[in-house]
UniProtKB/Swiss-Prot annotation:
Coiled coil: none annotated. One of its GO terms (molecular function) is sodium channel regulator activity. The modification Isoleucine amide is found at residue 33. It comes from Cyriopagopus lividus (Cobalt blue tarantula). The keyword Hydrolase does not apply. Spider venom neurotoxin that blocks voltage-gated sodium channel Nav1.3/SCN3A in human (IC(50)=80 nM) and rat (IC(50)=160 nM). Partially inhibits human Kv11.1/KCNH2/ERG (25% at 175 uM). The presence of a 'disulfide through disulfide knot' structurally defines this protein as a knottin. This is Beta/kappa-theraphotoxin-Hlv1a. Belongs to the neurotoxin 10 (Hwtx-1) family. 11 (haplotoxin-2) subfamily. SUPFAM superfamilies: omega toxin-like. Keywords: Amidation, Disulfide bond, Ion channel impairing toxin, Knottin, Neurotoxin, Potassium channel impairing toxin, Secreted, Toxin, Voltage-gated potassium channel impairing toxin, Voltage-gated sodium channel impairing toxin.
Amino acid sequence: ACKGLFVTCTPGKDECCPNHVCSSKHKWCKYKI
């Protein structure tokens, strides 16, 4: 299962949902700009 918006993630390890990216600053999934 992919991680949704604002779900905690580890950059380069966890998979965020399509059109989302793991923020290395906040350590959560956010929308790609």
